[in-house]
Design a protein with these regions (language model features):
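Feature activates predominantly on carbohydrate-active enzymes
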Residues: 1-172, 179
Length: 180
Protein backbone atom coordinates (compact mmCIF):
# COMPACT_ATOMS: atom_id res chain seq x y z
CA UNK A 1 0.00 0.00 0.00
CA UNK A 2 1.43 3.36 -1.03
CA UNK A 3 0.89 6.67 0.73
CA UNK A 4 -1.13 7.84 -2.27
CA UNK A 5 -3.21 4.64 -2.24
CA UNK A 6 -3.99 5.15 1.45
CA UNK A 7 -4.96 8.75 0.72
CA UNK A 8 -7.39 7.65 -2.02
CA UNK A 9 -8.81 4.96 0.29
CA UNK A 10 -9.58 7.65 2.87
CA UNK A 11 -11.38 9.63 0.16
CA UNK A 12 -13.51 6.56 -0.61
CA UNK A 13 -14.40 6.24 3.08
CA UNK A 14 -15.27 9.95 3.21
CA UNK A 15 -17.65 9.45 0.29
CA UNK A 16 -19.37 6.58 2.10
CA UNK A 17 -19.73 8.46 5.39
CA UNK A 18 -23.25 9.44 6.41
CA UNK A 19 -24.05 12.10 8.96
CA UNK A 20 -27.03 11.88 11.31
CA UNK A 21 -27.01 14.90 13.61
CA UNK A 22 -23.67 14.84 15.41
CA UNK A 23 -22.98 11.20 14.52
CA UNK A 24 -21.14 9.87 11.53
CA UNK A 25 -21.42 6.32 10.26
CA UNK A 26 -20.50 4.07 7.36
CA UNK A 27 -22.80 1.23 6.36
CA UNK A 28 -21.15 -2.17 6.48
CA UNK A 29 -19.83 -3.00 3.04
CA UNK A 30 -17.06 -4.62 1.07
CA UNK A 31 -15.03 -2.28 -1.13
CA UNK A 32 -13.16 -3.13 -4.29
CA UNK A 33 -11.89 0.13 -5.70
CA UNK A 34 -9.34 1.22 -8.26
CA UNK A 35 -9.28 3.95 -10.89
CA UNK A 36 -10.63 3.23 -14.34
CA UNK A 37 -8.08 5.67 -15.75
CA UNK A 38 -4.47 6.32 -14.73
CA UNK A 39 -4.86 10.05 -15.38
CA UNK A 40 -7.98 11.70 -13.99
CA UNK A 41 -7.58 15.39 -14.52
CA UNK A 42 -9.01 18.84 -14.75
CA UNK A 43 -7.74 21.80 -16.78
CA UNK A 44 -8.14 25.31 -15.41
CA UNK A 45 -7.64 28.12 -17.95
CA UNK A 46 -6.32 31.09 -16.00
CA UNK A 47 -4.68 32.57 -19.10
CA UNK A 48 -8.03 33.95 -20.21
CA UNK A 49 -9.44 34.70 -16.75
CA UNK A 50 -7.38 35.00 -13.58
CA UNK A 51 -8.62 32.93 -10.62
CA UNK A 52 -7.45 33.68 -7.09
CA UNK A 53 -5.09 31.32 -5.28
CA UNK A 54 -7.77 30.72 -2.65
CA UNK A 55 -10.23 29.55 -5.30
CA UNK A 56 -7.61 27.38 -7.04
CA UNK A 57 -6.87 25.69 -3.71
CA UNK A 58 -10.57 25.08 -3.10
CA UNK A 59 -10.83 23.49 -6.54
CA UNK A 60 -7.81 21.26 -5.88
CA UNK A 61 -9.29 20.15 -2.55
CA UNK A 62 -12.51 19.15 -4.33
CA UNK A 63 -10.58 17.36 -7.10
CA UNK A 64 -8.69 15.43 -4.46
CA UNK A 65 -11.89 14.37 -2.68
CA UNK A 66 -13.10 12.81 -5.91
CA UNK A 67 -9.73 11.15 -6.57
CA UNK A 68 -8.82 13.33 -9.51
CA UNK A 69 -5.03 13.17 -9.71
CA UNK A 70 -4.01 15.86 -12.23
CA UNK A 71 -4.49 19.63 -12.19
CA UNK A 72 -3.57 21.09 -15.60
CA UNK A 73 -2.80 24.79 -15.07
CA UNK A 74 -3.18 26.70 -18.39
CA UNK A 75 -1.13 29.81 -17.55
CA UNK A 76 -0.77 31.62 -20.88
CA UNK A 77 -3.21 32.65 -23.52
CA UNK A 78 -3.88 35.42 -26.05
CA UNK A 79 -5.36 37.55 -23.26
CA UNK A 80 -2.49 37.37 -20.76
CA UNK A 81 0.70 35.74 -19.54
CA UNK A 82 -0.25 34.84 -15.94
CA UNK A 83 3.07 33.52 -14.60
CA UNK A 84 5.51 36.08 -13.24
CA UNK A 85 8.72 36.45 -15.21
CA UNK A 86 11.72 38.03 -13.48
CA UNK A 87 13.78 38.12 -16.68
CA UNK A 88 10.97 39.51 -18.86
CA UNK A 89 8.71 41.53 -16.51
CA UNK A 90 7.00 43.18 -19.50
CA UNK A 91 5.03 39.93 -19.91
CA UNK A 92 3.18 40.78 -16.69
CA UNK A 93 2.72 44.47 -17.46
CA UNK A 94 -0.95 45.48 -17.40
CA UNK A 95 -0.66 47.04 -20.87
CA UNK A 96 0.14 43.60 -22.32
CA UNK A 97 -2.97 41.95 -20.85
CA UNK A 98 -6.29 42.31 -22.67
CA UNK A 99 -8.39 40.77 -19.89
CA UNK A 100 -8.05 41.28 -16.13
CA UNK A 101 -4.91 43.44 -16.49
CA UNK A 102 -2.29 43.24 -13.77
CA UNK A 103 -3.49 39.84 -12.53
CA UNK A 104 -0.81 37.15 -12.52
CA UNK A 105 0.74 34.56 -10.21
CA UNK A 106 4.08 35.24 -8.57
CA UNK A 107 6.82 32.65 -8.71
CA UNK A 108 6.29 32.07 -4.99
CA UNK A 109 2.56 31.47 -5.53
CA UNK A 110 3.28 29.00 -8.33
CA UNK A 111 5.66 27.03 -6.09
CA UNK A 112 3.13 27.19 -3.26
CA UNK A 113 0.44 25.71 -5.52
CA UNK A 114 2.78 22.88 -6.54
CA UNK A 115 3.30 22.08 -2.83
CA UNK A 116 -0.44 22.33 -2.14
CA UNK A 117 -1.20 19.89 -4.96
CA UNK A 118 1.39 17.43 -3.63
CA UNK A 119 -0.21 17.58 -0.17
CA UNK A 120 -3.49 16.57 -1.83
CA UNK A 121 -1.96 13.87 -4.07
CA UNK A 122 -2.70 15.87 -7.19
CA UNK A 123 -0.03 16.37 -9.86
CA UNK A 124 0.15 19.94 -11.13
CA UNK A 125 0.99 20.16 -14.83
CA UNK A 126 1.74 23.75 -15.85
CA UNK A 127 1.06 24.80 -19.43
CA UNK A 128 2.73 27.56 -21.40
CA UNK A 129 0.80 27.52 -24.67
CA UNK A 130 2.96 27.98 -27.74
CA UNK A 131 3.31 28.94 -30.50
CA UNK A 132 -0.46 29.42 -30.93
CA UNK A 133 -2.51 31.39 -28.38
CA UNK A 134 0.43 33.73 -27.89
CA UNK A 135 -0.88 37.25 -28.55
CA UNK A 136 0.20 38.34 -25.04
CA UNK A 137 3.78 37.33 -25.92
CA UNK A 138 3.57 39.28 -29.18
CA UNK A 139 2.25 42.39 -27.39
CA UNK A 140 5.12 42.23 -24.90
CA UNK A 141 7.97 41.58 -27.34
CA UNK A 142 6.67 42.76 -30.73
CA UNK A 143 7.90 39.42 -32.10
CA UNK A 144 6.03 36.24 -32.95
CA UNK A 145 7.20 33.16 -31.03
CA UNK A 146 8.08 31.50 -34.34
CA UNK A 147 10.45 34.29 -35.42
CA UNK A 148 14.21 34.09 -34.84
CA UNK A 149 13.94 36.77 -32.14
CA UNK A 150 10.93 35.08 -30.58
CA UNK A 151 12.71 31.71 -30.41
CA UNK A 152 15.71 33.29 -28.64
CA UNK A 153 13.38 34.88 -26.07
CA UNK A 154 11.44 31.63 -25.67
CA UNK A 155 14.58 29.66 -24.89
CA UNK A 156 15.40 31.97 -21.97
CA UNK A 157 11.78 32.13 -20.89
CA UNK A 158 11.35 28.35 -20.89
CA UNK A 159 14.52 27.97 -18.81
CA UNK A 160 12.93 30.31 -16.27
CA UNK A 161 9.60 28.45 -16.33
CA UNK A 162 11.39 25.12 -15.84
CA UNK A 163 13.19 26.55 -12.79
CA UNK A 164 9.87 27.67 -11.30
CA UNK A 165 8.39 24.20 -11.80
CA UNK A 166 11.54 22.17 -11.08
CA UNK A 167 9.60 19.81 -8.77
CA UNK A 168 7.06 18.97 -11.49
CA UNK A 169 7.84 16.11 -13.92
CA UNK A 170 5.91 17.56 -16.89
CA UNK A 171 5.53 20.88 -18.67
CA UNK A 172 2.72 21.16 -21.22
CA UNK A 173 3.45 23.42 -24.19
CA UNK A 174 0.06 23.46 -25.88
CA UNK A 175 0.96 23.42 -29.59
CA UNK A 176 -2.64 23.65 -30.76
CA UNK A 177 -3.96 26.01 -33.43
CA UNK A 178 -0.56 27.05 -34.77
CA UNK A 179 -0.63 29.50 -37.67
CA UNK A 180 2.24 29.38 -40.15
Amino acid sequence: VSEQGAYWAIQTLRQLTERQGKRYSIQGCEITDWPAFRIRGFMQDVGRSYISMEELKREIEVLSRYKMNVFHWHLTENQAWRLESKIFPMLNDSCNMSRMPGKYYTIEEAKELVRFCKEHNVLLIPEVDMPGHSAAFIRAFRHDMQSKEGMAILKLLMDEVCEVFEEVPYLHIGTDEVKF
